[in-house]
A protein has these predicted regions:
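Conserved N-terminal beta1-alpha1 strand-loop-helix module at the mouth
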Residues: 1-92, 97-125, 145-148, 152, ...
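A short acidic, helix-capping loop that chelates divalent metal ions and anchors anionic groups
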Residues: 38, 75, 133-139
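Glycine-rich ATP-lid loops
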Residues: 142
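C-terminal binding/interaction regions
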Residues: 181-184
């Protein structure tokens, strides 16, 4: 089964840098993003399908995964690598039944018990958050769960996890230290240079970056 890896970038239909989404996605996977999640709550089905097909032509040759937020029908029709679902979307057992064996299904939860149920129902990875306060969903700022909850969800589920919500290059090491990867939207899509932002996250993932200040690494 494919794995979303260490860094998933969620898209915005209009990146702040002003360049076309396809160009920004190409820059991100070229800089090392391991997965792209196409997230567009406003596009009609035809537009979303066409965008998915165009992005897949970029991600596949680069060895990155492409998952579609919410829309299993679009993901399957386009031949995407997977779909990401929430608690109000299609139930996991139904999504699993409709999908081919190697199709990746992600699920959002911050609750260890729900994470266990999601794993049993067919989820392949979990998005866990909001870890910190987030600009994309300001109402969640007071409900930040922190890295320890990410660790707890990962342990309970036994699945690959991606911390999400308010993650920046300055705090990403705290999430990577839990054994999870990260998923980011604003930190990349709002950046003037998205590829540079992706590279900063990779630097945060290095063992040196995850070593607490004042503690020397063992050679």
């Amino acid at each position: 089964m494919p794995d979303p890896g260490r860094l998933m970038v969620l898209t915005h239909p209009r990146p702040a840098c002003g360049r076309p989404l396809e160009q920004v996605v190409a820059e991100c996977v070229g800089a090392g993003a391991t997965a792209i999640q196409l997230r567009d709550k406003t596009a009609d089905s035809r537009t979303l399908l066409e965008t998915t097909i165009r992005l897949l032509a970029i991600t596949a040759p680069a060895g990155a995964l492409l998952v579609v937020n919410d829309r299993l029908d679009i993901a399957l029709a386009a031949g995407a690598d997977g779909v990401h679902l929430g608690s109000e979307d299609l139930p996991l057992p139904s999504a699993r039944r409709l999908s081919p064996p190697d199709f990746l299904i992600g699920y959002s939860t911050d609750d260890p018990d729900e994470a266990r149920r999601a794993a049993a129902a067919g989820a392949d990875y979990l998005g866990v958050g909001a870890v910190f306060g987030t600009r994309s969903k300001p109402g969640l700022a007071d409900e930040a769960i922190g890295p320890d909850r990410v660790r707890a969800v990962r342990k309970a589920s036994g699945l690959p996890c991606l911390g999400i919500g308010g993650i920046t290059p300055d705090n990403a090491a705290r999430v990577y230290a839990t054994g999870a990867g990260i998923a980011v939207l604003s930190a990349v899509m709002s950046a003037p240079h998205p590829a540079a932002a992706v590279r900063q996250f990779h630097q945060a993932a290095s063992p040196r970056a995850r070593t607490p200040k004042g503690r020397r690494q063992t050679p």
